[in-house]
Amino acid sequence: MKKYIRWVVIAIAIPIVLFLILVVLLYCPPVQNWAVKRVASYASQKMGMEITVDRVRLVFPLDLGVEGVRVLQANDSIAGQTDTIANVGRIVANVQLMPLLSNKVEVDELSLHDVRMNTANLVHEARIKGKVGLLLVQSRGVDLNSKTIRVNQAQLKDANISVELSDTVPPDTTKTPVYWKIKVDKLQIEHSKALLRTPRDSMAVLVDLPKLDAKNGYFDLYKNLYRLETLDWQNGSLNYDQTYKPRTDGLDPNHIHLTELNLGIDSFYFCQPELKMNLRVCAFKE
């Protein structure tokens, strides 16, 4: 009888031991690099792109670092040429383990460093391209059940992004409601620029953000409701051009160039058709 019990214990122990060995191996750098290359190869085949990763590092329990991520796609008009969809110098993801067991996500750090991107034809509505020095998010309150996100801190630094809207987008008849609610305690943007172009370059808007701070934001994506407690934009600039409109002397509403722009807003609220805010500071040169 004891012999049978021993064999039963051994049979139960073998898969447990093998699982523990596998877990330990996943924290060995050579195994990590081998595994990530296999995953990148599989993703490349499924997505029809070339995805490569230079190096990966996983520290117990879920502190992940990835270096040298490149995503290439064949050019849709020139044979033999590829477009770089993304080139990311480093990705850091530090996620707490225990909250995952209760369907919650707590992210101590999710950051992307030295990013260059070009969505090419992946997004029909627009082409987004540019570079980002740092994108950092800390979130200790993502609840997958209640569809709520609490962002403790978000930072964007050294970004230069352009968005070119398309005029050939078919109507989307498959839209589904989005019920997520997002709270943002603190948002910081430094040394960044954003350019928006409408189809056929009929309008261009360029925004320069040397320093922008926003606090206590709330965004209900289902109701399209957006609130901010405070927003401060310091020493920025704004260019607005109706490209095909002739220029006129004096204040030209079709061609506006604001510099040394300082803007302070309290209690911003927007939920169509209602817009409310307290304008604390507004100063600029034109």
Regions found by a protein language model. Name each.
Residues L72-Q73, S202-M203, P246-R247, K285:
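Short, surface-exposed beta-strand-loop junctions and turns on beta-sheet-rich folds
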Residues S41, D172, T176-V178:
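Sec-dependent signal peptide cleavage junction
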Residues M1-G48, D76:
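N-terminal type II signal-anchor transmembrane helix
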Residues R127, T168-D172, P246-D252:
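Flexible, surface-exposed loop regions and adjacent strand-edge segments
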Residues D54-L165, P177-R200, D208-D241, T259-C282:
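Flexible beta-edge/linker motif
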